[in-house]
UniProtKB/Swiss-Prot annotation:
Expressed in cotyledons and rosette and cauline leaves. Expressed at low levels in roots, shoots, flowers and siliques. Interacts with NAC92. Pfam families: Myb_DNA-binding. Residues 78-140 are annotated as: Disordered. One of its GO terms (cellular component) is nucleus. It comes from Arabidopsis thaliana. Its main location: nucleus. Keywords: DNA-binding, Nucleus, Transcription, Transcription regulation. This is Transcription activator GLK2. PROSITE patterns: HTH_MYB.
Length: 386
């Protein structure tokens, strides 16, 4: 059974606290039509529409449905409360407009307050903490008050450098530089920024120059000076890989070095008689490198045929290759060549006294020279080297 709760009805005759309830306890669902049937239900549905009349049975009397009249006091209270709400809304609107106008005035004061960009930036940063209105002011101000970027041309930079050099790099300040330059388009902030970059770049260049100077000093310190603290020794130089050190040719008067039997150039040597006293003799030829060497010939094949740094005339073995008379314009130099007897005597001294150094100009024969000489003499059966 469906039960409908009583609904309160407000009656405004003499008091607003008087209520009347209508009792719907006698109403049941038995008189309602059945809407669940499927089929030809048009007649039943039209017949059942009249069930709404049953809801209002017994409500014809004046005591049940009296005239609804609203008290003037209640109506005044409702109308007064509505007017108050309208006034409150109007007040809020006016307050918001006043606040926006005040914010616009603050933005204008901040934008036109100081001529220096640094103070304006501080004001804007302080205003960021106040809320969204300061951000709007910042965006409007940046669009209106943003200054163009300064183009430091070579001429402008030259004036800046002259002003800095006049004041001193360490003592120069932006205000004094700006006064000396006397350029209307520049501000103190522009000059200060350019001065900081100039000092940083100059410091970097000085550091590089100092490093290069110290490196040169260290490099020259490793090179010893002959005769000063080094016992007259020559400084060591790194050799070129694969090439022997260059030795300047030495000319010892009009004498030739002593050639030893077995050297490849000895059989081909032919003495030359000088035509004058001032004639110079060419250096002995160096043995040609065999074709079997893949690259550069060995170092010992390119050595001169006589020791370097010593004269041919010496106290030891003075009878070998040393003239016994003075040279002059009337006595032209003679191509003195040692005889076979003197050569055999020198070789005999070397064999008998192996602990003594070889005489000047006497060198052991090379392997190639010995093999060439043996082949020239017809010796073909040569034992292998140990």
């Amino acid at each position: 059974m469906l039960t409908v709760s009583p609904a309160p009805v407000l009656i405004g005759n003499n008091s607003k606290d008087t209520y009347m309830a209508a009792d719907f306890a006698d109403f049941t669902t038995e008189d309602l039509p059945d809407f669940t049937t499927v089929g030809d239900f048009s007649d039943d549905l039209l017949d059942g529409i009249d069930y709404y009349d049953d809801l209002f049975i017994g409500f014809d009397g004046d005591d049940v449905l009296p005239d609804l009249e609203i008290d003037s006091e209640i109506l005044g209270e409702y109308s007064g409360s509505g007017r108050d709400e309208e006034q409150e809304m109007e007040g809020n609107t006016s307050t918001a407009s006043e606040t926006s106008e005040r914010d616009v005035g603050v933005c204008k004061q901040e934008g036109g307050g100081g001529g220096d960009g640094g103070f304006r930036d501080k004001t804007v940063r302080r205003g960021k903490r106040k809320g969204k209105k300061s951000k709007d002011c910042l965006s409007d101000e940046n669009d209106i008050k943003k200054k163009p970027k300064v183009d430091w041309t070579p001429e402008l930079h030259r004036k800046f450098v002259q002003a800095v050099e006049q004041l001193g790099v360490d003592k120069a300040v932006p205000s004094r530089i700006l006064e000396i330059m006397n350029v209307k388009s520049l501000t103190r902030h522009n000059v200060a920024s350019h001065l900081q970059k100039y000092r940083s770049h100059r410091k970097h260049l000085l550091a590089r120059e100092a490093e290069a100077a110290s490196w040169n000093l260290r490099r020259h310190a490793t090179v010893a000076v002959p005769g000063v603290g080094g016992g007259g020794k020559k400084p060591w130089t790194a050799p070129a890989l694969g090439y022997p050190p260059h030795v300047a040719p030495m000319h010892h008067g009009h004498f030739r070095p002593l050639h030893v039997w077995g050297h490849p150039t000895w059989p081909k040597h032919k003495p030359n008689t000088p035509a004058s006293a001032h004639r110079t003799y060419p250096m002995p030829a160096i043995a040609a490198a065999p074709a079997s060497w893949p690259g550069h010939p060995p170092y010992w094949h390119q050595q001169p045929l006589y020791p370097q740094g010593y004269g041919m005339a010496s106290s030891n073995h003075s009878s070998i290759g040393v003239p016994t008379r003075q040279l002059g314009p009337t006595n032209p130099p003679i191509d003195i060549h040692p005889s076979n007897e003197s050569i055999d005597a020198a070789i005999g001294d070397v064999i008998s006294k192996p602990w003594l150094p070889l005489p000047l100009g006497l060198k052991p024969p090379s392997v190639d020279g010995v093999m060439t000489e043996l082949q020239r003499q017809g010796v073909s059966n040569v034992p292998p080297l140990p």
